[in-house]
Amino acid sequence: GTSQADVALLVVPADQGGFEGAFSKEGQTREHALLAFTLGVKQMIVGINKMDATTPDKYSETRFNEIQAEVSRYLKTVGYNPEKVPFVPISGFMGDNMVERSSNMPWYKGKILVEALDNVEPPKRPSDKPLRLPLQDVYKIGGIGTVPVGRVETGILKPGMVVCFAPTGLQTEVKSVEMHHTQLEQAVPGDNVGFNVKNVSVKDVKRGHVASDSKNDPAKAAASFQAQVIVLHHPGQINPGYSPVVDCHTAHIACKFAVLEKRLDRRSGKALEDDPKFIKTGDAAIIKMEPSKPMCVESFIEYPPLGRFAVRDMKQTVAVGVIKGVEKKEAGGKVTKSAQKATGKK
């Protein structure tokens, strides 16, 4: 979820003990901020909540300032510029400063929550890049056929285009594109669409596959990829050979930590050690990773939404990462009849 967001709203409690608990080493709040930054969410708003429950005085400016200072310090270490992060004192329970300015905190002169949200810069949608559309689902619709569904992350999808699906290399023509039951001339980044493809069985395309333009840097399967990874929670040490599940865009596939190349300083990114024997909670590292099954990923620089991932094991997020480079497999996939017609290949 975090990897799809344009802005992060970090909610921290202001009540006595509540903030300390949430913001402790064991608390989730720090992890949420780190996760957001690592996964490319560059805009942050902090809501300091439960202002109606501060002690000894309700709606305490002193408590607000104390929390703002501590959270700012942490956000700076993560990589955010606290000067650019609005801190809004709110009460979700009482409704203070959510959509209307509260008379309980006359000392606060900044934007209220809804204004801070309205002030977010919409990110530039990369429609000039080649098409990448990770599939969320594939439906079989009577009388229409196979309809893959997903969000256009980069580029443009149009009827008549011959798309290539990675990691299989399957090529076929797009007959039509729909969003919310309306036919589109073209779909652009951010659009959640369904598109109809001919001569393709539901078994051939799956969630986690990526549609791309067969004529413009088509997506391919990754033999391996190099990633910068931050370990958030692991009870022991992570050795080469560790194979947890990696969630990247809509794909959910076990990947092996094949080679631990370097251990890094988490804040500066400088190398601390080559070929470490293991890494543990709190470490950052450059790792060569190998998918256990065919998988399509991209470097973060070229295609950000396909270049960041979460590592999951033991029902929690063990690590997050950003892909630096991909070693691609040359795909020799099936070309359907409609693709041959559309491209004039016999």
From Swiss-Prot:
- Tell where it localizes: Cytoplasm
Q: What Gene3D superfamilies does UniProt report for this protein, alphabetically?
A: P-loop containing nucleotide triphosphate hydrolases, Translation factors
Tell whether Acyltransferase is among the UniProt keywords.
no
Which named protein is this? Elongation factor 1-alpha
Q: List the disulfide bonds.
A: none
Task: Give a GO molecular function annotation for the protein.
Answer: translation elongation factor activity
**PANTHER family, A to Z:** TRANSLATION FACTOR (PTHR23115)
Question: What GO terms fall under cellular component here?
Answer: cytoplasm
Highest taxon, organism lineage: Eukaryota
The free-text function statement in the UniProt record for this protein reads:
This protein promotes the GTP-dependent binding of aminoacyl-tRNA to the A-site of ribosomes during protein biosynthesis.
The protein's UniProt keywords, in alphabetical order, are: Cytoplasm, Elongation factor, GTP-binding, Nucleotide-binding, Protein biosynthesis
Is Protein transport a UniProt keyword of this protein?
no
The protein's predominant localisation is cytoplasm
The family line of this record is: Belongs to the TRAFAC class translation factor GTPase superfamily. Classic translation factor GTPase family. EF-Tu/EF-1A subfamily.
Q: Which PROSITE patterns does the annotation name?
A: G_TR_2
- Domain (tr-type G): give its ranges: 1-127
Organism of derivation: Eimeria bovis
Chain positions recorded as GTP binding sites: N49, K50, M51, D52
